[in-house]
């Protein structure tokens, strides 16, 4: 039964993800910031959907941080530095089907604190 529950949760997250992606997209000056959360770490990237190119990315494994709130703050600070170096000040936040709570909310708030308008 446990496998069915996990499969259902993943199916529901993917449905939410598709609903969100149908409504938002990014461009070169206003990219989409996509977040992926695994059990161990976080991945965040800025995507230009018009050209289908990743403009900037930060991997939590390379920073040596975990997928918790403190790690989210560190990843957001590093990602904000990367975006500012590329002269990107505003973006669209794509939570990728995850609930805007906990780590995802801290990540978005930390990006805002570091000067990125979402």
Curated annotation (Swiss-Prot):
GO terms for cellular component: cytosolic large ribosomal subunit. One of its GO terms (molecular function) is 5S rRNA binding. Keywords: Ribonucleoprotein, Ribosomal protein, RNA-binding, rRNA-binding. InterPro entries: Ribosomal_uL18_bac-type, Ribosomal_uL18_bac/euk. The keyword RNA-binding applies. GO terms for biological process: translation. The keyword Ribonucleoprotein applies. Part of the 50S ribosomal subunit; part of the 5S rRNA/L5/L18/L25 subcomplex. Contacts the 5S and 23S rRNAs. Belongs to the universal ribosomal protein uL18 family. This is one of the proteins that bind and probably mediate the attachment of the 5S RNA into the large ribosomal subunit, where it forms part of the central protuberance. This is Large ribosomal subunit protein uL18. The gene is rplR.
